Amino acid sequence: MGANEDQEMELEALRSIYEGDESFRELSPVSFQYRIGEDGDPKAFLIEISWTETYPQTPPVISMNAFFNNTISSAVKQSILAKLQEAVEVNLGTAMTYTLFEYAKDNKEQFMENHHPGSSTTPIANIISVETPSAAPSSKKKDKKEQLSKAQKRKLADKTDHKGELPRGWNWVDVVKHLSKSGSKDDE
């Protein structure tokens, strides 16, 4: 079998295995992302695997450069990638995308043991507290009224009288229609 046939078979297998799995994303027929960890988990990370033309005889390209991984230090990313590269060397020549995703899921705690999510959120909190005082003087300015376009003003004028009030009875219920829906007293 050629490399393309192996890739087609693995692609079909990945689609059937991860069908309905929200953590898996197929970016293209040769590029895949998998989120390791649940939504809201501070130790969750995203792995992207892209196949080369001669994959699986040559190793795939593994990346952690997604925006999702911005809170993870580069040292932790490098250690995860190094451990995944070891798994690639073991599985070279076979379909390994599923194996790599499962390996990462099984070893998530070990991979992220040096990741400290609390330390990465501190600078963000400092940025927010620095911006808060600068927002206070702007609130002292007069609040402008909402500006309406001509079409919005015309529509509002059509609905209301010249004083801006809604006409009498605008929300009244048609009595006959209401009674026909609710039925008569004798129907009980």
From Swiss-Prot:
It comes from the Eukaryota. Residues 155-166 have a biased composition (Basic and acidic residues). This is RWD domain-containing protein 4. Residues 132-167 are annotated as: Disordered. InterPro entries: RWD_dom, RWDD4, UBQ-conjugating_enzyme/RWD. Coiled coil: none annotated. Residues 9-111 form the RWD domain. It holds the Pfam family RWD. It comes from Rattus norvegicus. PANTHER family: RWD DOMAIN-CONTAINING PROTEIN 4.
